[in-house]
Structure formats: structure tokens, C-alpha cells
Curated annotation (Swiss-Prot):
Glycosylated residues (UniProt): N6, N15, N41, N48
Protein name: Muscarinic acetylcholine receptor M3
Major localisation: membrane
Subcellular location: Cell membrane; Postsynaptic cell membrane; Basolateral cell membrane; Endoplasmic reticulum membrane
Organism of origin: Pongo pygmaeus (Bornean orangutan)
Amino acid sequence: MTLHSNSTTSPLFPNISSSWIHSPSDAGLPRGTVTHFGSYNVSRAAGNFSSPNGPTDDPLGGHTVWQVVFIAFLTGILALVTIIGNILVIVSFKVNKQLKTVNNYFLLSLACADLIIGVISMNLFTTYIIMNRWALGNLACDLWLAIDYVASNASVMNLLVISFDRYFSITRPLTYRAKRTTKRAGVMIGLAWVISFVLWAPAILFWQYFVGKRTVPPGECFIQFLSEPTITFGTAIAAFYMPVTIMTILYWRIYKETEKRTKELAGLQASGTEAETENFVHPTGSSRSCSSYELQQQSMKRANRRKYGRCHFWFTTKSWKPSSEQMDQDHSSSDSWNNNDAAASLENSASSDEEDIGSETRAIYSIVLKLPGHSTILNSTKLPSSDNLQVPEEELGMVDLERKANKLQAQKSVDDGGSFPKSFSKLPIQLESAVDTAKTADVNSSVGKTTATLPLSFKEATLAKRFALKTRSQITKRKRMSLVKEKKAAQTLSAILLAFIITWTPYNIMVLVNTFCDSCIPKTFWNLGYWLCYINSTVNPVCYALCNKTFRTTFKMLLLCQCDKKKRRKQQYQQRQSVIFHKRAPEQAL
């Protein structure tokens, strides 16, 4: 947009003439020009709204009517879109439970900062430009600047927090994600706002009392202590160039790590296909353990103390009869493993939506499958790397050897019967470490040697192989889903960072140039550069909608006023389910 003035001085920059050339005495940024958090002009081309003959009483500030209409219409549309977009983000977070994730808490904080800019900063700045003077008084000026700077600083701080959160989530999934809760996210968001407030609000509001006088002329509004180009440039370095550099480096690391995960997952799926035609015993690799520890130092400490134990997983099975018919039935019903509790238990304990490979620990693991009626030990050492449930010997829980001996003795009493019990509900799958004791010599011989495999019945071998393949498939599926979520989060982050860099860079380049060439930047460019920084708050909700399908569908639902319909459908569904339940209850009682 192009703004003109009837006076010889610029209506936006008091020390810039109509030809935009400074005299030597006017070196540096104009009196009314200060950086907005080191990134854009808070007086924003506000200027010394007075002509050489005295203050102007023109409410249009020397602009024509059509210029005022154009400026008011354009900036009003931008402010309205900013307000509506960020309100949609906040309301969507409130009404849609699927959006209440840790990632979106940071986006919610960013939306609050953008909403403040759209409601307060944009409109006051538009009035400032149109009237060519600040007509609301000194207190309103200082409050506006304080709110504007705090909200903008909070936006940058939130972007930094989001970048670090994504980086640690991908590079340290086990250690960081265990601590990554909504409470911790709230603390980080609170710190971002508190730091922003402490950095800017006291200095803006009370600087005139610190120095003993107010040097901002009447009719102008700018930060008193940011009047020198060198100070302005210093704040730009600290507030824009450094954060952008840090965020760019973090995003590059996130991108490389995501690409690495994609290749690993492709190899994992390929090895899973080969495993279906081979034995389920594979060489081990790195990372996951059922105890969720990943620090090798802790593992070595447990090894030095020579503590041994095992991790138990239980699953429910059907009644088992040791007959050929039952064996044939079990052999043909591989799909029944899809719905048992073992799959769910291992799936939940071995992987989650927000867990990935984070440890470089290399170890050999063994699974001991003990079935009632048989003391056969199935050695399944060297499970596949990050895909299977791996239990380092040093990380297993401590178990008293006497209790283990009692358990073996109890199982032996069942063996004396010569047959399986007619029905049982629990089968223990025990992940055991080597125990160098005479009482468990049979266990030690099979676990301690990674190549020894005792003869198994056809039934046991089939069940064990199915179990291993099902577990592998489920963990692979979990990892694939987790990778998809990470990619979506990375896409949202990349869109936000790209919008931030595009909208904030032009003004900060002008700040850099103005430090060395104070007459090179036209006043109109200062205006556009500052407004472009404000437009970042307008673009952010669009980034959320483009990169997140849940946000997009929720926005559509809110804009079309479909919230009540969705609630009614949900209530009707719950009522139907309640009626069905009450109808079935008497029948089951009979």
C-alpha cells in the first residue's frame, strides 16, 4: 500500500523526507521507529504526526478518502480473518477431544497469541496509520506496545518450544516421551508467556520512570529505549535471527531422523515378510525392552549386582484337550490369536503411539514358553531388533530363586498326571534371564546357550511361531502408525516455520540494511514489512487446517454449525446402545 502526506515530512517516519533521504543529522532509524521484539516496527512507521506549522487536526492524517477506505478495508479484512481463524482453533480444541494432544496444546498457546494480535494490535496500528498520529494518550500507547511485544515474543517462544518438543520426541522417544505430559506442556507454555512478559512489559511501561523523563513526543507512540539503530539491530539478532537459525537446524535434524525411520520401517516390513517362511528365531538388534529402560549404565549396574528376574505376560486361552482332534483344531485356527489378550498385552507394553526406538543397547534375549503339563522350554533367543519384544538380561526384574524352584516343582506335579488339564485360563509366557543355579539347570542350559533348541511338539512349535509373527506384525503396525503421526506433526511444524520465516524476514532485513544505510528503505516498505509480520498471525490457522485433517474437519463442522447435529447423533447412538443392553440383560439372566 502507498501512503502519502501533504507535509514535507513523512507521515510515517518523521525524519524521512518525501524523497526518503536523510541528512547526516538524521542518521539512524527515525525517532518513531522501533523494532517489534527485534523483528518489526512497533511505531511502525508511526511518525511525528505534526506538520512543520504545528499539529494537524485532519482526522484522515493527510490521506484522501479513497486511500483511507482502501487501507481500512484491507486491514479490516486481515484482522477479521485473523480473529475468526484463531477463534476456530481455540473452539476446535475445546469441542473435539481428538485434538487434545500435547502437540496441540502448543498450537493452542500460539493461537491465543495470534488472537491477541488480531484483536488489539492490528486495529490500533491501522488507526495509527490512518490518523497519522496517536490520539489515545500515553498510557494507552504503552499498554498497546506492551501487549503487542509480549504476544509477539510469546509466538516466537512457542515456536521454539514446538521445535524442541518435536526434536526430542523423535530423537529421544523413550526418555523424553515418558515425561511428555499435558501438565509438563502447560508448564512450558506458561514459562514462554512469563519470560515474554518479564522481558518486555516492565521495560516498556516503566522505562520513563527509570530514566526520570518521557522522551516520546505527544502524538507519537514508540518504545522509548529502542531509538538507536544499533540497539534495534541487536534486538533483531537476539529475537529473530537466532531463533530462526535454531529452529531451522532442529527441523533439519527432524527431517533427517524421519527419513531414517522411514527406511528402517521399510526394512522392517521386508524382514517381516521373510520371517513368515523362516524360523522365528532371528539375530537381535537394538532397542526395546519390556521394562521400558534404555540406559545402558543402569543395565551394567544390575549386571554387576547379578540380579536375575523375569517379566511375565499372561494371556487367556480356550480349554485345551490333549487329543489329535484338538491339535488339528488349534492348528487350523490361527486367526484366534488375533483376539486374545496376549496380543493386546504385548502390543500395549512393547509399543505405543508415541514410542519409538531410542536405545543403542545390544543384547541377547530369550523367551521361555512353559505350558502346563510339559516342562519343555522353547528357546527363542536373538529376537529381531527393534521390532520384537526384547528383554536385556540386566534389565529384568529381580525374582527370588526359591520362588522359581517352587514354581517349577508345582508344574512338575502337573506333569506327573501325564496329560493336560481339561481347561485352564492362563498360560504364562516368561521372559527369563540366565540363572546359574543347580535348581534351574534345565533353564540355564537353554537360555545361556543361544544356539541350543530342544525338540518341540508340532503344536507348541506352531503356536510359538504364530505368536512371534503376530507380535512382530502388531509392533510393525504400531511403528508405522507412529511414523505417520510424526510425519504429520513435522509437516505442521514445517508449514508454521515457513510462514514465520516468510512473513518476518523482510522487516528484519530492512532493520539490518538500515543499520548501515539509513536512507535506503522507503517508508512504504517499512509499513508493508511490519504488516507482513502481523499477517503471520493470519496464516497460522490456515497452516493447521492444511496439515491436519482433524483440524480441517472440525473447522468445517463449526463453520457449518454442525456441532449440535453431531451431539444429537451421539446421544441417539448412546440411547440405542442402552436399550439394546437392557433388552439383553434379562435374557442373559435366564
